[in-house]
């Protein structure tokens, strides 16, 4: 009956069909191999130390990379385990990628947390948590453009005259959390077959890459609305920001709520006893850290919406809007819009309260451009920020992700567009 119940409307769905669901098709790919190889690290790990890695030419291309660390055995491993949760993110203040001495991109400490909350699915977020949490060996994935997309793997074979370098600035608490004898960097190398290897080495390349811009942090006072000037360049896909003023001890490092420095906002690596007191999604991935509020079943809630401090730890942002050349880019919106509606429309992840984003792109996580705002052509970009609490000041950390073009020609590489 279903097959013969066919009318004019069905022609829009099945007329002149181009595909069948009952015969699998596939595409043949070029021959390749991969191998993970440890890099040589120059320098000695220490508080506020600086380490460098010149990427070895062990393969034709290099893709994903990881930092291996040894967290101290004295870190807390029980419920409310502040010091071991996401501990790998405590190691690096920032890491800079350069090619031939030119800075290509830079990743900042807070960007690791914002990236994992917004860009990762709940399953990957749990695995990220387990990778970066614990005593002993922990891993921190690098998240430059070539680490996240194999189609953007850096062609070392085409960079005969320029070296690829990573410079790591360590935090001033490195020795508190990590054994200074261990700081390893691993790179996943791609080996191409003969014909493709020849093409990569002889022709020029143009890669559409993604960069992260961060021009510093701004203090937002408690009285009234503050206008903050944005000094960004290039076609920007998205703005991402958070507020933090509680230092780096324990869960304060990741506490972006209105309850600054609150001991009631805790990091928890024990998922067995959170059900009655969880206002953010939890997973069954044992060992993945979670930020929660109200230890031991207390009354404190941790949600984005609400009035601080009456409702406990809430998202600190009251209202926000973007102003370009004196014109409102959109109508002023509440913090909940940027914490929940924007990520719902444009992101894979569900960020916890206090993390905000605004996307100019339909799909900011995609390499394919789906919308930008060219800040190089904007004379005056500002944001208007109003906080919920009248008795505290907060520090705003804002980041912009943008497109640029990496050109590789005649054995050398560099950016097509500078700042």
Q: What are these model-derived regions, one by one?
A:
Residues 1-419:
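Short, low-complexity Pro/Thr/Gly
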């Amino acid at each position: 009956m279903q097959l013969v119940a066919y009318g004019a409307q069905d022609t829009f769905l099945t007329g002149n069909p181009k595909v069948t669901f009952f015969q699998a098709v596939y595409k043949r790919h070029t021959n390749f191999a991969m191998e993970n190889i440890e890099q040589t690290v120059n320098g000695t790990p220490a508080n506020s130390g600086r380490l460098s890695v010149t990427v070895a030419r062990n393969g034709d291309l290099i893709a994903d990379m990881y930092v291996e660390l040894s967290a101290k055995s004295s870190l807390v491993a029980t419920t409310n385990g502040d010091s071991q949760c996401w501990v790998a993110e405590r190691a690096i203040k920032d890491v800079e990628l350069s090619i031939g001495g030119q800075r290509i991109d830079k990743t900042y400490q807070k960007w690791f947390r914002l990236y994992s909350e917004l860009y990762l699915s709940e399953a990957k977020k749990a695995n990220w948590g387990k990778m970066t949490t614990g005593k002993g060996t922990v891993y921190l994935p690098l998240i430059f453009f070539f680490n996240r997309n194999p189609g953007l793997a850096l062609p070392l074979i085409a960079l005969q005259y320029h070296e690829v370098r990573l410079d790591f600035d360590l935090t001033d608490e490195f020795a508190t959390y990590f054994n200074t004898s261990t700081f390893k960097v691993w790179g996943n190398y791609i080996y191409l077959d003969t014909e493709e290897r020849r093409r990569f080495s002889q022709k020029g390349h143009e890669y559409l890459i993604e960069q992260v811009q961060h021009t510093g942090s701004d203090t937002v006072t408690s009285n009234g609305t503050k206008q903050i000037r944005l000094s960004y360049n290039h076609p920007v896909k998205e703005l991402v920001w958070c507020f933090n003023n509680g230092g780096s001890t324990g869960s304060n490092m990741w506490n972006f709520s209105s309850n600054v420095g609150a001991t009631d906002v805790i990091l928890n690596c024990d998922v067995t006893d959170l059900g009655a007191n969880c206002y953010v999604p939890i997973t069954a991935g044992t060992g993945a850290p979670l930020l929660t509020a109200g230890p031991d079943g207390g009354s404190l809630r941790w949600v984005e919406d609400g009035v601080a401090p009456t409702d406990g730890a809430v998202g600190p942002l009251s209202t926000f809007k973007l102003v370009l050349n004196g014109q409102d880019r959109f109508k002023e919106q509440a913090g909940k819009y940027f914490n929940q509606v924007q990520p719902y429309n444009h992101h894979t992840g569900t960020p916890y309260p206090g993390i905000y984003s605004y996307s100019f792109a339909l799909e900011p996580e995609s390499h394919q451009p789906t919308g930008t705002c060219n800040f190089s052509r904007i004379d005056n970009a500002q944001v208007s920020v109003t906080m919920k609490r009248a008795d505290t000041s907060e520090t705003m950390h804002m980041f912009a992700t943008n497109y640029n073009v990496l050109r590789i020609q005649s054995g050398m590489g560099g950016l097509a567009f500078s700042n």
